[in-house]
Amino acid sequence: MAKKSIGQLKLQVPAGAATPSPPIGPALGQRGINIMEFCKAFNAATQEMEKGAPIPVVITYYQDKSFTFSLKTPPVSFFLKKEAQLKSGSKEPGKVSVGSISRDKIRSIAESKMKDLNANDIEAAMRMVEGSARSMGLEVVG
């Protein structure tokens, strides 16, 4: 018989840096999930990824206190800031530009995010990434 799922939890955890300290520990502890077991499994699963990259993770937990988790790709904003070499986006997007990004880089970001985006083709995914870039105050050139 299949295990009965009692909920899901969504977190953004830096790759290879899951620790029992807040915010991870309390979020898992109040749901009865073994914190150290999750931290070890998450860090092992993300050891090949860029250290510190924010990884969205969906944790499904069950009645018998066990859990499974699935990893997503880092947010588009992380890739955009990395490609444009920024620390943060514009305080006033649309008015103040903080930099520019080429369509080639937009395409490479869209290709890497394709499995997590709600898009049918690469062009639609590129438009989504361009929208995120504009919302951060980046100009799309080329």
From Swiss-Prot:
Entry-linked InterPro entries: Ribosomal_uL11 (IPR000911), Ribosomal_uL11_bac-typ (IPR006519), Ribosomal_uL11_C (IPR020783), Ribosomal_uL11_C_sf (IPR036769), Ribosomal_uL11_CS (IPR020785), Ribosomal_uL11_N (IPR020784), Ribosomal_uL11_N_sf (IPR036796)
CDD domains: Ribosomal_L11 (cd00349)
Keyword entries, A-Z: Methylation, Ribonucleoprotein, Ribosomal protein, RNA-binding, rRNA-binding
GO biological process, one term: translation
Alphabetical list of SMART domains matching this protein: RL11
Keyword Magnesium appears in the UniProt entry: no
Gene Ontology molecular-function annotations: large ribosomal subunit rRNA binding; structural constituent of ribosome
Keyword field contains Ribosomal protein: yes
Post-translational modification: One or more lysine residues are methylated.
Lineage: superkingdom: Bacteria
GO cellular component, one term: cytosolic large ribosomal subunit
UniProt subunit comment: Part of the ribosomal stalk of the 50S ribosomal subunit. Interacts with L10 and the large rRNA to form the base of the stalk. L10 forms an elongated spine to which L12 dimers bind in a sequential fashion forming a multimeric L10(L12)X complex.
NCBIfam families for the chain: L11_bact (TIGR01632)
Function of the molecule: Forms part of the ribosomal stalk which helps the ribosome interact with GTP-bound translation factors.
Similarity field: Belongs to the universal ribosomal protein uL11 family.
Protein name: Large ribosomal subunit protein uL11
Source organism: Bartonella tribocorum (strain CIP 105476 / IBS 506)
